[in-house]
Amino acid sequence: MIRRLSVAFLSTYRGPQADAPGVTSTGPLAVAAHDDLVSDDLVAAHYRLASMRAPGETKAAVYPGDAGSGAALQIVTDQAPMLVDSVTVLLHRHGIAYTAIMNPVFRVRRGLDGELLDVRPAAEAAPGDGADECWILVPITAAADGEALTEATRLVPGILAEARQIGLDSGAMIAALHGLANDLATDLEGHFPNAERKEVAALLRWLADGHFVLLGYQQCVVGDGNAEVDPASRLGVLRLRNDVLPPLTDSDDLLVLAQATMPSYLRYGAYPYIVVVRESPGASRVIEHRFVGLFTVAAMNANALEIPLISRRVEEALAMAHRDPSHPGQLLRDIIQTIPRPELFALSSKQLLEMALAVVDLGSRRRTLLFLRADHLAHFVSCLVYLPRDRYTTAVRLEMQDILVRELGGAGIDYSARVSESPWAVVHFTVRLPEGTAADSVDTSLENESRIQDLLTEATRNWGDRMISAAAAASISPAALEHYAHAFPEDYKQAFAPQDAIADISLIEALQDDSVKLVLADTAEDRVWKLTWYLGGHSASLSELLPMLQSMGVVVLEERPFTLRRTDGLPVWIYQFKISPHPSIPHAPDAEAQRDTAQRFADAVTAIWHGRVEIDRFNELVMRAGLTWQQVVVLRAYAKYLRQAGFPYSQSHIESVLNENPHTTRSLIDLFEALFDPSQETDGRRDAQGAAAAVAADIDALVSLDTDRVLRAFANLIEATLRTNYFVARPDSARARNVLAFKLNPLVIKELPLPRPKFEIFVYSPRVEGVHLRFGFVARGGLRWSDRREDFRTEILGLVKAQAVKNAVIVPVGAKGGFVVKRPPTLTGDAAADREATRAEGVECYRLFISGLLDVTDNVDKATGAVVTPPEVVRRDGEDAYLVVAADKGTATFSDIANEVAKSYGFWLGDAFASGGSIGYDHKAMGITAKGAWESVKRHFREMGVDTQTQDFTVVGIGDMSGDVFGNGMLLSKHIRLVAAFDHRDIFLDPNPDAGRSWDERKRLFDLPRSSWADYDKSLISEGGGVYSRQQKSIPISPQVRTALGLDADVEELTPPALIKAILKAPVDLLWNGGIGTYIKAETEADADVGDRANDQIRVCGNQVRAKVIGEGGNLGVTALGRIEFDLAGGRINTDALDNSAGVDCSDHEVNIKILIDSAVTAGKVTPEERTELLLSMTDEVGELVLADNRDQNDLMGTSRANAASLLSVHARMIKDLVDNRGLNRELEALPSEKEIRRRADAGIGLTSPELATLMAHVKLALKDDVLASDLPDQEVFASRLPYYFPTRLREELHGEIRSHQLRREIITTMLVNDLVDTAGISYAYRITEDVGVGPVDAVRSYVAINAIFGIGDVWRRIRAAGDAGVPTSVTDRMTLDLRRLVDRAGRWLLNYRPQPLAVGAEINRFGAKVAALTPRMSEWLRGDDKAIVSKEAGDFASHGVPEDLAYHIATGLYQYSLLDVIDIADIVDREPDEVADTYFALMDHLGADALLTAVSRLSRDDRWHSLARLAIRDDIYGSLRALCFDVLAVGEPDENGEEKIAEWETTNSSRVTRARRTLTEIYKDGEQDLATLSVAARQIRSMTRTSGTGTTG
């Protein structure tokens, strides 16, 4: 039973009415979803409630709730209409929220005493079987008021009884209404003596026709203010009520409409109307027919012209209006239709017209119209209000209700509203008057109506109206005011007074698209500020804005956003914040300080919004230290630099230190401004000293060592700053684009790691950061787009070390720059679009970075040559105008962009600023980098006896044919057999290539734009080969590939990384690197040490590489330790810096040539049009000049390798000297430790080729520094070589301009040093300075003199030509080393025997021509063993293809050295040089001096002391020969030959000569020619002399 009842209840489930209390959803819902509403206990309780009920009785109870259900109202009553409506209205009126209502109708059988016998759903019962009952169940929400529910439950029986009675009497009431209408229509008895009776009859029929819900009826006899009800007439609710209303009207009107004082329970908020019809059956007797009911919706919306009785009054009103043509008839008709229908019953035609005309007169005026009408019984006052439609809001309506209740003394109020398309809203208020109110106490006079109307008008005046009034004095147009009256959102209007909006409008009107304005104001609350943030064009989320504010050191207490559109449609967002500063931030002491703080705060947050300031705690300094945001940026930039420098403290810690020490922080800024503010330049030094002292005093007072270190680091950085663009105000500067640049002196920055460059520029902005490191005034190197945001300086420092070494061969020293993009574009998923967006941002950051560099770089006035300091830059260093850049990783195509930036600055270098641009030397077209590296390859192979240009050889490579270095390199010989190669996309395998056909195909790919290995013609690949993607899971390995790569026989497939490793370890002749990345390391290195994670999977160790030679066209392909390991394992390799130096060399030539040509353009000697043609016409010769440097260096490296073991001790001392005096770091440069050098000495090996290359570079760099610091480049004897740096055409056409070149000193120096080191060897200058005790510059002087005197350069070139002609490298190396011995000995001679400092030009004049004349006659003077030795040596050279004259010249090299003594002696004794030569060489032969000298050469030189001892003996022997020559010449005659002179001398000095010869004979016979015996021999020769032999002539 219970379950059946539950199903019946649930089948009628419906939600609450939409306007019921607590409604969240309405309407019927799925039954299954509400099983939990009806528990068995609940249904059982309902069943118990229904178990006993008398007919007509209503049972109601409240179920208190259980574990399954909440509280519920339970009702059992007879079935009748309108039961549920009555219950829901009752609950609504008592404010009781319910969750559902269920009202199943059951067919019930009961016993005589009302006990329940049977119950079943009525639909299932047979007709006539029992009575229908409605069981109503209303689940109540838990929040419902218990007392209200109890009261509602008490009222239920009575209310439902009325509903039931209405249903029972419904027909009778309608019949009574029709009956009365008939009586009125016929009036047979004359009871209705009124002209309107037929209209009233029609009205009653209209009411009965669905326009009036009848609730009750009664007849009353009225008279003398009393009413008596006829009991038999009572129907509906009036049947159940005994109270009797007094007469409802005192007028003679036939029909009166009154309103009940109690609301109905049949409709929410509805008060029933009473339709009263007066019948007069006798002279003094009046009967009121009272029909109580509710107008239906149809009635309330009915056309007034279709309602009987009312329609006539309306027509009469309109007719009256027609008499005046000015009255708008249709408008009047429309207005009348807006009057609530019940009110029409109370209005006459005249009143209707007056009301309508008043509304017409209201027009578009923004005011309110009120019509008052009091009930004659003083029960209520009807208030009809017309107001502008847009002014009708809930808030306005509620305020109107308050006014009307207050002003009319009401006890309550009801309303109904009508809002249509007309300009007005119509609200009908009914003010309920307190019971007992006297009719004459209700004031509805015109005066009171007007007064209340004014109050209502004020109530309807909205915020916008008040704002417009408040703006009377503001200069804002009426149209704008009208716009903003509607534009401001409601929440804004609730938050702000209208007058506050006037200031906002002014700010809003000043906004631009994507602009911002902030206003900070104090509030009445302590330490609480109001911040208003205005945004034009773009909104922002709270998650965007809060971090900005929090970074300023404030807490956001409250946030309110508002949105509106400006008059021009620009969307504007207003955010109002309540903020409070951190408790540790001091409050501004006075109003002026508060205003200043507010302005700085607003400016700072504005800058943050625009991206000019980063979001971090540095921003707190605006309030803590009283700084501007620009000053904060200075400190932030220094902090960023410290982090890049490897400072051990985090940025967070640095922020905390500065914030906790605001006074010191302020002092740091004072110091910075004192140093660099151009407006303080006159007394800036004094201010700076004071500021520095203040900073020092602040720091000295600190207790914390960490804090001390942080603040001292900032002070150190500021004092190490040489220049800044902070004060630059030019609109085209980097500073104007929010870029800050510091030029620093790294040598005095204590926190910097080694090595420290000479100059450094740090560029900072929120968008880009970068550094540019320079190791000298004239320096060059590439700019890299780095992806290492956290440590890009570390990356650049590593690169600049290699660049410094690479630049050893060119004019500028090493430099390197790099930048990071800090705000890359958000990825969209569209790869092409993302790439383009990323590139565009990179280009813009590159521009900003270069602009930052140029902001602090001097310029040169081309007309005068004067150096010009950038405006508004305080310079704390000397002139510094040389800044050039080059392409690097990520910036390969950016040269033109760099030159555009330089041009915008009017920079003196023009497009020489960045070489490789569209007007310049195209490195790829020239193939210059690859060709330079190929010189290294050719040299390595020549040493193995292989000619790469005529003999086939096998190669594996890194790169593809579209690349510059790889592509050009693999076309430099048609004998390349490329076995395998890979790039980032593909792997190429050709195990048995045909050299010729594969060269042709590689050429085709090289010429094919954007080609890859996938484009290679597969039909040309040998059997077993192919092209495979690196994305494949595995790659099959053919037998042919196994053989070519030296793989084990069981290898049948490899993953791409494993295959690439196999390629790198392949047993081939050459490994050619033309790619990007590091692929070979040392076994002792971890992959993490390499810093190239992308290639960790494929990297191999140097001792695993089986290629015989590695050619490094690309950079960093092998680690420094990896190169050494490969070399020690038997491989041949230099350094990448040496191999690929042709690129930078070519760029340097381009820069210097452009400087030269541009000077000619300025002078009018060359037109701008001719400039490009002139530049490009020299491409080939420039290439040859560059490659000559590569050949020279490779020849130097070859001979250095050949001599490495014997010179290890010298090299070790050189390294130590560079460490001690030049700041060289062995570990950084991968040079061996002293322990490793001892190990190699024991093993009989010297420095490896990479180590020699590094040592060579540092020797050149050191020598360049020394020469530049001297006056050598300014002397003609050195400067005369300057023109030969330039191509022939420039030498011919611009000879004068060459002499005045801006970098003439640097070019001369570079030429001098390259010539010296490449010709005389790496150790020449060091050994000379060590041996003789002179400076490096003296060594250069001696070399230049010797070079000119003996024609060393010409001889050297002839040796190289012999090598090119096929003479073995071992032979040409021997010849070169022999030539260097001449240079060594001759150089020392000049430094020992000639006045110092050496007058190079004079010495050349003194010796040059005579040496040239005497040298060809050497064969005339050499005798005995000397002649035999020379002949044998020359013959050996000639046997290897060396031209005989060259062979003989080299063989006599050490004898030519003696010509210096010969010529000097001849000058001293005034004898002919040929006579002296004959005597000198006769003495040498006679004494066997050459044998002794040869023995000396065989002495050990393992350490410095042995070397010095060797040198001393040799010098002693030569010195004795010189002295003896003087003695012999003194006793001989000019016409005697050498032997005759010697014989005569021996006769004269027989005793000394005899003793000496006896000792020498014993030494020769003994054969033990060690240091001791040779020392004795030298002493014996010296003992023969009678003079010193060391005299000099001027």
From Swiss-Prot:
<feature type="active site">
    <location>
        <position position="816"/>
    </location>
</feature>
<dbReference type="InterPro" id="IPR049059">
    <property type="entry name" value="NAD_Glu_DH_HM1"/>
</dbReference>
<dbReference type="InterPro" id="IPR036291">
    <property type="entry name" value="NAD(P)-bd_dom_sf"/>
</dbReference>
<dbReference type="Pfam" id="PF21073">
    <property type="entry name" value="GDH_HM1"/>
</dbReference>
<dbReference type="InterPro" id="IPR049062">
    <property type="entry name" value="NAD_Glu_DH_ACT2"/>
</dbReference>
<dbReference type="InterPro" id="IPR024727">
    <property type="entry name" value="NAD_Glu_DH_N_ACT1"/>
</dbReference>
<dbReference type="InterPro" id="IPR048381">
    <property type="entry name" value="GDH_C"/>
</dbReference>
<comment type="function">
    <text>Catalyzes the reversible conversion of L-glutamate to 2-oxoglutarate. Highly specific for NAD.</text>
</comment>
<dbReference type="Pfam" id="PF21074">
    <property type="entry name" value="GDH_C"/>
</dbReference>
<keyword id="KW-0560">Oxidoreductase</keyword>
<comment type="subunit">
    <text>Interacts with (unphosphorylated) GarA.</text>
</comment>
<keyword id="KW-0520">NAD</keyword>
<dbReference type="InterPro" id="IPR046346">
    <property type="entry name" value="Aminoacid_DH-like_N_sf"/>
</dbReference>
<dbReference type="GO" id="GO:0004069">
    <property type="term" value="F:L-aspartate:2-oxoglutarate aminotransferase activity"/>
</dbReference>
<dbReference type="Pfam" id="PF21075">
    <property type="entry name" value="GDH_ACT1"/>
</dbReference>
<dbReference type="Pfam" id="PF21076">
    <property type="entry name" value="GDH_ACT2"/>
</dbReference>
<protein>
    <recommendedName>
        <fullName>NAD-specific glutamate dehydrogenase</fullName>
        <ecNumber>1.4.1.2</ecNumber>
    </recommendedName>
</protein>
<dbReference type="GO" id="GO:0004352">
    <property type="term" value="F:glutamate dehydrogenase (NAD+) activity"/>
</dbReference>
<dbReference type="InterPro" id="IPR049058">
    <property type="entry name" value="NAD_Glu_DH_HM2"/>
</dbReference>
<comment type="similarity">
    <text>Belongs to the Glu/Leu/Phe/Val dehydrogenases family.</text>
</comment>
<dbReference type="InterPro" id="IPR049064">
    <property type="entry name" value="NAD_Glu_DH_ACT3"/>
</dbReference>
<dbReference type="Pfam" id="PF21077">
    <property type="entry name" value="GDH_ACT3"/>
</dbReference>
<dbReference type="Pfam" id="PF21078">
    <property type="entry name" value="GDH_HM3"/>
</dbReference>
<dbReference type="InterPro" id="IPR007780">
    <property type="entry name" value="NAD_Glu_DH_bac"/>
</dbReference>
<dbReference type="InterPro" id="IPR028971">
    <property type="entry name" value="NAD-GDH_cat"/>
</dbReference>
<dbReference type="InterPro" id="IPR049056">
    <property type="entry name" value="NAD_Glu_DH_HM3"/>
</dbReference>
<dbReference type="GO" id="GO:0006538">
    <property type="term" value="P:glutamate catabolic process"/>
</dbReference>
<dbReference type="Pfam" id="PF21079">
    <property type="entry name" value="GDH_HM2"/>
</dbReference>
<dbReference type="Pfam" id="PF05088">
    <property type="entry name" value="Bac_GDH_CD"/>
</dbReference>
